Amino acid sequence: MAGHSKFKNIQHRKGAQDKKKAKLFASLIREISLSAKSGTDIQYNHRLRAAISAAKFNNLPKDRIEKAIAQANNKDNYENYFEITYEGIIFDGIAIIVEALTDNTNRTAANVRAIFSKYGGNLVGTGNASFLFDRLGIIKFESKASTSEKLFDAAIEIGAEDIELDEEYNVVYTPIKLFTNIIEELAQLFGYPVESYIGWRPRNTVLISDTEKAQKLIKLVNALDDDDDVQRFFGNYEFSEQIYNNSLT
């Protein structure tokens, strides 16, 4: 029985990983096709170049990238998709901004609203959560010990607002008006980033110190992550390592 149980757990984890990968690939393909509608020359279409870079980093096969670009020429593909932003508040002043790409705004709004409601939060009007964030460019490079300090110096010199260095990614934050120029200049020195987009950064963060609340928040963000229409979400929360680990048990 123990072996059977372990096998079932492995199957469950693999199934969850496969589902997450499928959603990621679908999201990458959708972004490539939408970006390519503005032109397929990546020299002039920086959103498309960013989408392709993200796709390559996440191992989306080359033929699927090419097919996604070709789909942009079909007027029936993604013609009725809308980019929608939702703002939500949970407990303790925690705010989350959700960015979605959808062909059915009623469905997506209902799904996102239901997720917040289930875990003790609610959607709020435009500006009621986003005032806690700054809107800026976000550029992610793979973290490499040999280039991190050089990246930091170069980014600050050409106008970046801030840069965060960690074991997985080096994240450069830029004013929106300098976003494209900074990508191009850094790319000449360090190669193209693994991901780049206009996003949200919290001005201050709320430290979650209660295990029960942490569990509820983790379930909420996992539910958002599982929703096919949700592209990205940004929150003003952080966990201590102990609380986060306790919340997973």
Swiss-Prot record:
Chief localization class?
Answer: cytoplasm
One GO cellular component term noted in the UniProt record for this chain: cytoplasm
One GO biological process from the UniProt record?
A: regulation of DNA-templated transcription
Keyword set, alphabetical order = Cytoplasm, DNA-binding, Transcription, Transcription regulation
- Entry-linked InterPro entries: Integrase-like_N (IPR017856), TACO1_YebC-like_2nd/3rd_dom (IPR048300), TACO1_YebC_N (IPR049083), Transcrip_reg_TACO1-like (IPR002876), Transcrip_reg_TACO1-like_dom3 (IPR026564), YebC-like (IPR029072)
Q: Which GO terms describe its molecular function?
A: DNA binding
Where is this protein found?
Cytoplasm
Source superkingdom = Bacteria
* Family statement: Belongs to the TACO1 family.
Task: Write down what this protein is called.
Answer: Probable transcriptional regulatory protein OTBS_0251
Source species of the chain: Orientia tsutsugamushi (strain Boryong)
